Amino acid sequence: MSLGTGERRGETTPKEKLKIEGRLARWLVAFGFRLLQLWARTLRYEIDDRAGIVGKPVTENYVGALWHNRLLIFPLVLQRFFPQRHGAALISASRDGDLLADAVQRFGYDVIRGSSSRMGATAILQLTQVLASGRDVVITPDGPRGPAYELGPGIIFLAQKSGAPVLPMNLEYSRCWRLGSWDRFILPRPFAKVRVLISQPRYVKPTGTPEEFEAERLALQDAMMALVEMR
C-alpha cells in the first residue's frame, strides 16, 4: 500500500525537529550560562570609573554603549559593579538573537528585540519607555553585523528622543582569544585581568540637518573609541 505524500512511520516531522532543536538550544543556553559564571569567577577586575557612578545611589539613568565584541561577560560586569541598577538590553531579532535574549534574561535583564544599526520606531518607543521608567538601556551600537567599531544611527535617535545621556563603556583584557567573526569577538582567557572603563556621560544634541546628525554620530563614536586599547 502506498503511503502517498504523508509522513512515513518513524520519520521526524519538521515541527518535531524544531521542538528538538528548541529544547537543545535551551539546554545549551543553560549550560553556557553556568559555564560563564564559573569562568568569570577566575577573572580579576579593575575599575576605571570616570563617571563616578559605581557604588552610588541611582540618581540618573543611562543609555549604556559597548562595542559588540566586548559583550560576552558584560552582564556579569553589570551584576558585579551595578547591582542596584536595572534595565533592558537591545537584542537582534534574528534567530541567533533568540539564544542571546534567553541568556540575557537569565541575568535578570529585560530584552527588547531589534537592530541597533537599523532601530525601528517600535524598538525606539519601547526603549524610551524603559528609560522613562527610571531604568537603564544597554546597546551595542555596531551590532549585530557591523562594521566593527562603526556606530549605527539608532543610538543617536534614541538619545535624542529620550533625552537620556549615553554612557560609553569598554572592557579590556590582559589575555584573550579572538574569534574569526566580523568583529573578531573577544573571549577573555581564564585568570585574565579585566579592566572596566566607564566614560563621562554624553548628551546628544538635537539636530536639524544630516550634517549635524553625522557630527553627533561621529562625536559619540570617537568617545567610545577613546576607551579602546585592543582593536
Task: Please give the residue ranges for each predicted region.
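Catalytic core of membrane glycerolipid acyltransferases/transacylases, capturing the structured
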Residues: 60-118
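A cross-family acyltransferase "interaction/gating" segment
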Residues: 150-209
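C-terminal functional extensions of proteins
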Residues: 201-204, 208-229
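Acidic, metal-coordinating catalytic cores used for nucleic-acid/nucleotide bond scission
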Residues: 95, 117-120, 144-151
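Membrane-anchoring hydrophobic helices of lipid-metabolizing enzymes
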Residues: 2-77, 84, 191-193, 219-231
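Catalytic-site beta-strand/loop segments enriched in glycine and acidic/polar residues
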Residues: 126-158, 162
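Generic beta-sheet signal
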Residues: 114, 140, 168-171
